[in-house]
């Protein structure tokens, strides 16, 4: 875990513990490395690896081994890069903490490492993420807002910053 940009309440140890819980919940066995950094660094990664010259909230990089030993591939699942700046913006719009948003984005990235793709799976990833967020005690995120069928009305926090009424 590397925290290049601070997020209130987030420590490397807390992030490591959350990622372990999320990995287990998703069923990812290999190590997941997480970088929390600024928008400029994430934009650079997005440009370099996805040919998109814009910042984004989270990027996932599955580990692909060119080694003939499959045990090496099983040791590392991949890397996740999170923009602390965009996490703060998302959190403000959704009415929860930046700490919670970083966890939501880490979970989202881990789901991508497990092979899920919300751009092509007709909502399968969104439904899985919604279930896992509930299991891990996290609020609704942007992907849930993009797929209204996954919303639980009493738990959704509106973009106006309204608080949950649980």
Protein language model regions, located:
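An acidic/histidine-cluster motif and surrounding catalytic segment
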Residues: 1-102, 111-166
């Amino acid at each position: 875990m590397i925290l290049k940009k601070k997020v209130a309440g987030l420590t490397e140890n807390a992030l490591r513990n959350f990622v372990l819980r999320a990995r287990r919940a998703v069923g990812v066995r290999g190590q997941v490395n997480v970088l929390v950094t600024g928008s400029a660094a994430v934009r650079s990664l997005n440009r370099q690896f996805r040919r998109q010259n814009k910042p984004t909230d989270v990027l996932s990089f599955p580990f692909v081994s060119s080694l003939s030993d499959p045990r090496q591939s099983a040791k590392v699942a991949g890397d996740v890069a999170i923009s602390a700046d965009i996490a703060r913006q998302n959190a403000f719009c959704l009415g929860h903490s930046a700490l919670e948003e970083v966890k939501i984005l880490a979970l989202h990235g881990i789901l991508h490492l497990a092979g899920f793709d919300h751009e092509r799976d007709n909502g399968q990833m969104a439904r899985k993420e919604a279930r896992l967020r509930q299991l891990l005690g996290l609020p609704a995120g942007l992907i849930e807002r993009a797929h209204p069928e996954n919303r639980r009305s009493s738990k959704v926090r509106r973009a106006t910053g309204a608080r949950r009424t649980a």
